């Protein structure tokens, strides 16, 4: 049986909307937006296969509704950064790094994990985006 939030983030990404009923959300998700108006996490999600978007979207929704939540779904990375940990088909692992800002979950960076530890360049990029703001 699937999770209760099947495909909702995928639908929002596809339709370029993310303002769903947030009345029940404890930590509504927002995409980081660069000064140029780009939303790197949304772009990354759109490039993934539909089943991967669905899995990651369900995990983000779980965090939105159950925050604060810990392992195995969410882990603190320090410096105000957190990661949503998603297991994809074929043994692949995805991570979405976020920060908490003004009562929202700001999605800063997403990637497919290929090493045991989170690469420093991914952490540095997320931290740079956090410092820039853009929520």
Predicted features and spans:
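Basic, Lys/Arg-enriched alpha-helical interface segments
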Residues: 1-93, 101-105, 112-135
């Amino acid at each position: 049986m699937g999770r209760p939030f099947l495909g909702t983030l995928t639908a929002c990404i596809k339709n370029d909307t993310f303002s769903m009923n947030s009345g029940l959300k404890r930590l509504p998700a927002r995409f980081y937006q660069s000064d140029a108006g780009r939303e790197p996490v949304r772009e990354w999600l759109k490039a993934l296969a539909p089943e991967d978007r669905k899995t990651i979207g369900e995990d983000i929704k779980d965090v939105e509704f159950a925050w604060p939540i810990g392992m195995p779904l969410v882990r603190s990375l320090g410096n105000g950064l957190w990661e949503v940990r998603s297991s994809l088909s074929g043994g692949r692992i995805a991570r979405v790094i976020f920060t908490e800002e003004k009562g929202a979950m700001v999605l800063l960076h997403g990637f497919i994990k290929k090493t045991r530890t989170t690469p420093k360049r991914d952490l540095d990029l997320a931290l740079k985006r956090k410092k820039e703001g853009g929520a």
